[in-house]
């Protein structure tokens, strides 16, 4: 039941229309653009030579979207997943640094997994290369892979930050069973995918991880000690549906409660589509509250 997790409330005298919140929570995204070579990316960024696949920081999500959109148009690319990921963050009305670690998607799945693992590892050097270090890291469309999830957990643990992973499952039972492989205060697991109107004007299902990252960043910046608040039970802006129906009956046993009890962050329909979760899978209940984990990270 919701009472098991406390109550979130907000008192506000702000504007009736949403405004962007300035947040000091950088989001790191490991991403690829099918058909984009490292030379294309470096050239677009104004560099003459290309070494390894780049990691770039953008002052806000609008700048990142502009860069990726221009890269797609100028090279006639057809992969809009990164653009949709950035739009998911943008829809949460947050103004924060975005760090993109690019990697090449190969025709061989093994090579792709190696490349994405290297892109996630690159977040450790983000401060040196970009001047910014991520507080949240995601790898949408790939984090359901066991090896990618493991790398996200490893890097998040070494950097004392939070990684958000997307589960692959076709029903509630499968999603819950997947959590047998989780036990970390550094990971938030999300399921199922949610529907948005994507950047191409079509309804599409996308991973929750960038939306949750945007919600956390927004919550952090909403007030002075926002990092001590939970992102749970907040409206997920831009969401128009879920890939699988999630039963939610407030105060009663239901899909949403079973998922949350299994430490899975989900999406419920209750006066809008809302996040429902915020617990890690750590074996010690003290560290199952993500807000507590992140508060100790800030003051340590």
Tell where the protein language model's regions lie, with residue ranges:
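Active-site-proximal structural segments of metal-dependent nucleotidyl cyclase/transferase enzymes
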Residues: 82
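Membrane-interacting alpha-helical segments
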Residues: 11-12
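NAD-dependent ADP-ribosyltransferases
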Residues: 85
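Acidic/glycine-enriched edge-of-secondary-structure segments
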Residues: 73-76, 93-118
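A glycine- and small-residue-enriched flexible loop/hinge signal that marks low-structured segments
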Residues: 3-8, 17-23, 27-62, 68-72, ...
């Amino acid at each position: 039941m919701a009472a098991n997790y406390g109550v979130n409330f907000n008192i506000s005298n702000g504007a009736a229309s949403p405004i962007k919140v300035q947040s000091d929570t950088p989001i790191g995204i490991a991403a690829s653009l099918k058909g984009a070579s490292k030379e294309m990316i470096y050239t677009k960024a104004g560099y003459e030579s290309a070494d390894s696949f780049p990691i770039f920081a953008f002052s806000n999500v609008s700048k990142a979207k502009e860069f990726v959109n221009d890269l797609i148009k100028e090279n006639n690319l057809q992969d809009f997943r990164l653009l949709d990921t950035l739009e998911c963050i943008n829809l949460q009305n947050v103004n924060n640094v975005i760090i993109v670690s690019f990697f090449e998607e190969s025709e061989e799945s093994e090579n792709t997994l190696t490349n994405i693992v290297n892109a996630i590892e690159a977040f450790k050097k983000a401060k040196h290369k970009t001047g910014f270090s991520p507080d949240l890291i995601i790898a949408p469309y790939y984090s359901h892979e066991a090896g990618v999830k493991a790398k996200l957990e490893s890097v998040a643990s070494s950097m004392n930050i939070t990684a958000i992973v997307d589960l692959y499952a076709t029903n509630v039972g499968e999603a819950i069973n997947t959590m047998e492989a989780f036990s970390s205060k550094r990971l938030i697991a999300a399921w199922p995918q949610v529907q948005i109107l994507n950047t191409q004007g079509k309804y599409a299902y996308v991973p929750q991880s960038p939306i949750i990252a945007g919600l956390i960043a927004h919550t952090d910046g909403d007030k002075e000690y926002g990092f001590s608040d939970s992102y749970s039970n907040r409206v997920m802006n831009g969401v128009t549906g879920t890939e699988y129906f999630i039963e939610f009956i407030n105060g009663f046993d239901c899909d949403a409660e079973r998922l949350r009890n299994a430490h899975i962050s989900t999406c419920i329909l209750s006066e809008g589509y809302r996040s429902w979760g915020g617990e890690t899978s750590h074996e010690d209940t003290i560290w199952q509250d993500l807000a507590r984990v992140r508060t100790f990270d800030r003051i340590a």
